Amino acid sequence: HPKRHAMEGTFTLGCDENGIFTGLDCEIYFDTGAYASLCGPVLERACTHSVGPYCYQNTDIRGYGYYTNNPPAGAFRGFGVCQSEFALESNINLLAEKVGISPWEIRYRNAIEPGKVLPNGQIADCSTALKETLLAVKDAYESNPGRAGIACAMKNAGVGVGLPDKGRAKLIVHDGRVELYSAASDIGQGCATVFVQMVAETTGLGKEKIRNMGANSEVAPDSGTTSGSRQTLITGEAVR
């Protein structure tokens, strides 16, 4: 099975005297090995997430995938985002040092807020709470110099790219218990357990009163693919 893409890239990040980001220029190269596999979609995610959860005045992001005689690379946890986010966060730490402010402070000043627009055109909705999250860890970070690090990242969930996405579930009360039917495949990520927890939380019932009937497409509604970290988010909301 293909694993994570090896990445090389150049990230150039600029800011003003107050640490406010003025621009980001990225050039990303992915080694996809001997076969393309999912290099295209993975590279797309690496590029769209290379800006992180921050505001910018200007951005220019370019990504390239190339064949080599190495083993194939493809879909792997994080789907390209880990590589570009690591490069950006490392750059932010270096920039904070040059400006003379803390790594926490430069992230707080540039954090995306509700109503602001990410470089990919997405408007941050009311659930965006990056600044609140940074405030929650500020004391722990600043009271442990040299031992605690800090970084921010975002990751899409679901199929994305504007395609319709849906999840379905069916709940039946039988012999005093709730039977949960969903065709979502649990391949180790734990969605079968999460669905039961969501029913228990929503109804107030004990988990012993809820039974997950397993992924059986003959009796359960179509819940879509197990990919893109989407089952808990999409089918989970149907369960709720």
Write out the residue ranges for each language-model feature.
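Beta-strand segments within the central parallel beta-sheet cores of soluble alpha/beta enzyme folds
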Residues: H1, T22-E27, P103-I112, P145-A153, ...
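Flexible glycine/proline-rich, aromatic-decorated loop/lid segments
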Residues: F30, T59-G65, K170-I172, G206-R230
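Flexible loop/turn segments at secondary-structure boundaries
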Residues: H1, D31-Y35, E113-L118, A157-V161, ...
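Short acidic (Asp/Glu) and glycine-rich catalytic loops that position anionic groups and cofactors
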Residues: Y67-P72, N110-L118, D175-V178, V219-S227
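Helix-loop-helix junctions that connect adjacent transmembrane helices in secondary transporters/permeases
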Residues: N110-R177
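Glycine-rich and small/hydrophobic secondary-structure elements
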Residues: H1-E17, A73-K98, P119-E142, S223-R240
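Alpha-helical support elements that line or immediately flank enzyme active sites
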Residues: P41-H49, R77-E105, E132, A136, ...
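Glycine-rich loop/linker segments at domain edges
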Residues: A6-S90, V159-D165, L233
